[in-house]
C-alpha cells in the first residue's frame, strides 16, 4: 500500500483512496470520473473539506434527491484554468459563486449525499465546468499522488501557503521641494 504526504489534500488529516480515476465496474456507467477520499486512522468520520487550489467558486449545487453526486461545489483553478468538483458533501457548501478560495479555505464537510456506498469525497478534475466524459482529467495526477486504490494520503499542514497579503496602497512621496519629484519623473524615462 502506497503512502504519500501532500500539502494540498482536500482532507486536512489522513485519508485513503477508495476508488480512483478510470476504474470500471458495475458502479459506473463508463468509468469512474474522479478520485474518492475517505477518512483514515484518527481522522474524524465527517471531516471538513478544503480547496486543493487557489481559485474561484463557479458553481454550488444543492442536493434535492435526484443528483447522483449529491451536494457539490465547483472551483476553477487559477494556475491551470481547469475545474475541481467536490461531491457527496453532507450539506450545501458554505461558499457562493464568485468567492475566492485558497488551500486554507473550507469548502464543505465530507458526507454521503447522492449515490454512495458510504461517506467519502468524490473529487473530479476537468477542463470545463460542465462535465462530459471527454473533458475529465485524472485528479491524482494533478495532486501528485498515485492513482491507486488503497493509497494513504497524509496532509502536511506545515507547508500550507499563507493567505496572500493585501496589496498596500501606493504611498505618495513627499519632498520638501516638489519640483525635485517632478524632475525625477522625467529623468527616469
Tell where the protein language model's regions lie, with residue ranges.
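Acidic, glycine-rich catalytic/binding loops that coordinate metals and/or anionic ligands
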Residues: 1-11, 16, 41-43, 96-102, ...
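A structural signal for short beta-strand/turn segments enriched in small hydrophobics and glycine
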Residues: 49, 55-57, 98-110
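Assembly/oligomerization scaffold segments
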Residues: 37-38
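Residue-level signal for pocket-adjacent positions within structured domains
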Residues: 16, 32, 84, 105, ...
